[in-house]
Amino acid sequence: MSKKKGSNTLAENRKARHDYFIEETYEAGIELVGTEVKSIRQGKANLKDSYAEIRNGEVFVRNMHISPYEQGNIYNKDPLRDRKLLLHKSEIYKLVGFTTQQGYTLIPLSLYLKHGRVKVSLAVAKGKKNYDKRDAMLEKAAKREMDRQIKERSRY
């Protein structure tokens, strides 16, 4: 029997690309308990308002909500607990260099499966101001209008 094709994305932070300029992305493993993995596989994870921070040379993701697994009983952990991200030391040193600069933060973009393991796409990001968001919306609307015009002209 062949493997299932399709998206392995389990959760996505959709507002991240709207609220931040993404500078670099890193792939990180995440330290989870078995019931958390089962809950994530059911699609019960939320990355909204989550961020990562570096403490004592280790990277932790905060405010990532993973709903308790229904059949998990005593093995369920706190849904909003800090979870350790697994990165190489050299990557952590690069992230420390970025985050010490003013305005940069670490944002998880998505949770996905890779070879049966849950991974986090972690981005080094800089916050957008309100006028940057408006400019991005205007550019997107102009591009959509141009595409509509091109499609309309090529129809005849």
From Swiss-Prot:
SUPFAM superfamilies per record: Small protein B (SmpB)
Cell compartments where the protein resides: Cytoplasm
Record's keyword terms, sorted: Cytoplasm, RNA-binding
One GO term describing the cellular component: cytosol
Pfam family, one: SmpB
Main subcellular location: cytoplasm
GO molecular function: RNA binding
CDD domains: SmpB
TM ranges: none
GO BP annotation list: trans-translation
Family named by the database record: Belongs to the SmpB family.
NCBIfam families reported for this sequence: PRK05422.1, smpB
Role description: Required for rescue of stalled ribosomes mediated by trans-translation. Binds to transfer-messenger RNA (tmRNA), required for stable association of tmRNA with ribosomes. tmRNA and SmpB together mimic tRNA shape, replacing the anticodon stem-loop with SmpB. tmRNA is encoded by the ssrA gene; the 2 termini fold to resemble tRNA(Ala) and it encodes a 'tag peptide', a short internal open reading frame. During trans-translation Ala-aminoacylated tmRNA acts like a tRNA, entering the A-site of stalled ribosomes, displacing the stalled mRNA.
UniProt-recorded name of the protein: SsrA-binding protein
Organism: Clostridium botulinum (strain Hall / ATCC 3502 / NCTC 13319 / Type A)
Gene that specifies this protein: smpB
